């Protein structure tokens, strides 16, 4: 066994200084990194770390195993062009490849990834593409980069999992697709960059999740039916959260005063309204709490840390960045649900956060 805190290394990932591709060879584009944990051999086996670089052009996903003593490469996926991908082993030998495709993971990534089991082993949803447990390309929709995506059983009346994603390039807007095949179940179009979108179960009158984004400014059910269309009453387009005692999602929003000022929202069937804490205050009123950015309202971490199935949210103290403020609900609930960390996709999602 290695000593606690001992540094471990494994070769195989593209060097930090590597740049590539016309306008995209500068640091902001080449140095985009994501990471996650995936049970690539199935839930009964050890998990792998998946380290990722690049999503505006070339995309690399590096799966690494740890046996308690050393790191070893499981595989390295490289989508080098829009039409070609290869998978290499730890010695750099090509073990799988495909050429002349209509789309790969090249330029398809998002600002986050998602991990979930769609066929018995975990796969990585990499924006508009998905990488199989063996490093091969599972599918690519070709709809390109986006700022947000959600992977879950969004439609309980369909078998398997679904993905909701928004896209930066016009006119792609958003898409709702099968997580295993990439089949587009419905989509919306837009004339601009659709920079925000959320899938959350905010309305108990409709089965499954509801979805909304900046492009259409409509709330739709999981079948694409519009259930609310007042642009001035759209819910926040950031994070969903379990906070009060019912079984619907609440939302994390950001206000302008002061900057990066987080607060909770609740959907009432027609519009989203602020949801104060039990003391009548909002998250930003306590401990000088601020989010990591404004338009996405990103907290330091959101997870069911304490285990009663409602979620905690952590923000940093604007007056003292060494302080973290942990918020938890004190609202009673009549529902007894196992801690969310027992859910496979949820636990992996906390890891990639």
PLM region spans:
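Extracytoplasmic/lumenal domain signature
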Residues: 1-353
């Amino acid at each position: 066994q290695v000593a606690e805190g001992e540094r471990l290394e494994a070769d195989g990932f593209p060097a930090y200084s590597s740049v590539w591709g016309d306008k995209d060879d500068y640091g902001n584009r080449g140095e985009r990194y994501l990471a996650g944990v995936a049970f690539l051999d199935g839930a009964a086996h050890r998990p792998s770390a998946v380290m990722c670089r690049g999503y505006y052009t070339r995309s690399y996903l590096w799966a690494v195993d740890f046996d308690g003593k050393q790191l070893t490469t499981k595989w390295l996926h490289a989508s080098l062009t829009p039409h070609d991908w290869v998978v290499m082993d730890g010695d750099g030998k090509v073990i799988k490849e495909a050429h002349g495709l209509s789309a790969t993971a090249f330029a398809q990534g998002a600002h986050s990834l998602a991990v979930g089991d769609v066929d018995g082993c975990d796969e990585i949803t990499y924006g508009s593409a998905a990488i199989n447990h063996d490093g091969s390309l599972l599918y690519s929709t070709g709809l390109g980069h986006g700022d947000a995506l959600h992977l879950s059983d969004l439609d309980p009346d369909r078998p398997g999992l679904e993905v909701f994603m928004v896209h930066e390039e016009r006119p792609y807007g958003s898409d709702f697709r099968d997580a295993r095949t990439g089949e587009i179940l419905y989509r919306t179009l837009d004339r601009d960059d659709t920079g925000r979108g959320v899938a959350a179960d905010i309305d108990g009158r409709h089965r499954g999740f509801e979805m909304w984004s900046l492009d259409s400014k409509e709330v739709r059910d999981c079948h694409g039916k519009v259930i609310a269309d007042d642009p001035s009453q759209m819910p926040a387009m950031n994070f969903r959260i379990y906070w009060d005692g019912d079984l619907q999602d609440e939302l994390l929003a950001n206000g302008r005063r002061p900057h990066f000022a987080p607060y909770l929202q609740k959907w009432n069937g027609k519009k989203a309204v602020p949801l104060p804490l039990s003391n009548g205050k909002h998250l930003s009123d306590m401990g000088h709490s601020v989010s990591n950015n404004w338009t996405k309202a990103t907290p330091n971490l959101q997870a069911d840390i304490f285990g009663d199935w409602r979620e905690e949210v952590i923000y940093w103290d604007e007056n003292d960045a060494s302080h973290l403020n942990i918020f938890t609900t004190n609202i009673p609930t009549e529902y007894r649900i196992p801690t969310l960390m027992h859910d496979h996709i949820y636990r992996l999602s906390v890891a990639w956060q």
